[in-house]
Regions:
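Short coil/loop residues immediately preceding or within conserved phosphate-binding loops
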Residues: 122
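Conserved catalytic-core motifs of eukaryotic protein kinase domains, centered on the activation segment
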Residues: 110, 117-118, 143, 177-179
Length: 185
């Protein structure tokens, strides 16, 4: 299989010397924009961070992705629509056939220290296969999203999402079970 790292015009990359990109497919940072935006995509990889691409993944304009020291971001197949924001302090894993809409935020850390016993600053995030994440969703640390799930627009996901469900709300709660969805493209 051929692996490619495709960067179109509006892309900015800051990679530490010890950062690694593992390509087992193609990743494309796209500047396709139907609204005439001049927003660039940014990828910052700090010391010893790893970006792994398992298949083919597209990232549209306005992405803002940071992998902090020692963090790992693993992408299966699918796409991030415009203005995705990812803050990876530890580990974020995204499965195959995943559709993530615009203005989504995914953070595996609170980005600050808690002052109480048992507080954990970071917890990994895992997003399963065949997942559809709607516009302006926020996914917070420690969440696992099961296969074939749908996250409704505007939701804040603070707890695990079971397979074959639709969740919605702030915080997100299961509103439908035993669902199945397919692409209509």
């Amino acid at each position: 299989r051929k692996s490619k790292f495709i960067c179109l015009k509006k892309s900015n990359f800051q990679l530490a010397k010890s950062a690694k990109i593992i390509l087992n497919g193609t990743i494309m940072f796209s500047d396709n924009d139907i609204n005439g935006s001049t927003r660039q995509s940014n990828l910052r990889m700090d010391k010893d961070s790893i970006l792994e691409i398992k298949k083919n993944f597209s990232i549209y304009y306005g992405a803002d992705i940071i992998l902090f020291k020692g963090a790992k971001l693993k992408l299966g197949s699918g796409f991030f629509n415009s203005n995705i924001k990812i803050r990876c302090h530890e580990k974020i894993e995204i499965g195959e056939n995943v559709a993530i809409s615009h203005d989504v935020t995914i953070m595996d850390s609170d980005a600050h220290e808690g002052l109480w016993e048992g507080y954990e600053k970071t917890k990994p995030i895992k997003i399963g296969n065949h997942v559809w994440i709607g516009t302006r969703v926020t996914i917070l640390k420690g969440v696992t999203i099961g296969d074939n799930a749908i996250i409704a627009a505007g939701s804040v996901v603070t707890k695990d999402v079971p397979n074959n469900t639709v969740v919605a709300g702030v915080p997100a709660k299961v509103i439908k079970i035993n669902i199945n969805w397919k692409w209509i493209i």
